């Protein structure tokens, strides 16, 4: 039996590696990703990433894969407060590893991409039009 903490760590690593990896493949310079249909490619791949991560970890940890899910379940009284901190630590560390692996696998592409938004886009989201009054 695998520890639920290890399962959350591995699942979140898979989720971020596959999800961020496809965004990097589509957005960065000189990759083989399809630039013609990025929205379909990215959304389908993220859906697949969630499916794979949940399938791999669901039996062992419930496949929260996100601190917001864990906190929401605790607030709803459907998950133990005692396990929450361990789950969140495992998820954050897994997300860090998945993001780092994406960077390592695409390091040459990150270095050759001059568009800062394309580089940032594989790791986070931001408004397309920055307007602090409307964005917050």
What is the meaning of each model-derived region?
Residues 1-136:
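Membrane-interface helix-loop junctions and terminal tails of multi-pass membrane proteins
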């Amino acid at each position: 039996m695998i520890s639920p903490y290890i399962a959350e760590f591995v699942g979140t690593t898979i989720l971020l590696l596959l999800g961020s990896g496809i965004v990097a493949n589509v957005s960065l310079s000189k990759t083989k990703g399809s630039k013609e249909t990025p929205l379909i490619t990215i959304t389908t791949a993220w859906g697949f990433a969630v499916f794979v991560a949940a399938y791999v970890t669901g039996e062992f940890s419930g496949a929260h894969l996100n601190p917001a899910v864990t906190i929401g379940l605790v607030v709803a009284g459907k998950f133990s407060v005692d396990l929450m901190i361990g789950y969140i630590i495992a998820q954050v560390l897994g997300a860090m590893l998945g993001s780092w692996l994406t960077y390592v696998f695409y390091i040459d592409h990150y270095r050759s991409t001059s568009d800062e938004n394309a580089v940032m886009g594989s790791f986070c989201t931001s408004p397309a039009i920055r307007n602090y009054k409307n964005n917050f």
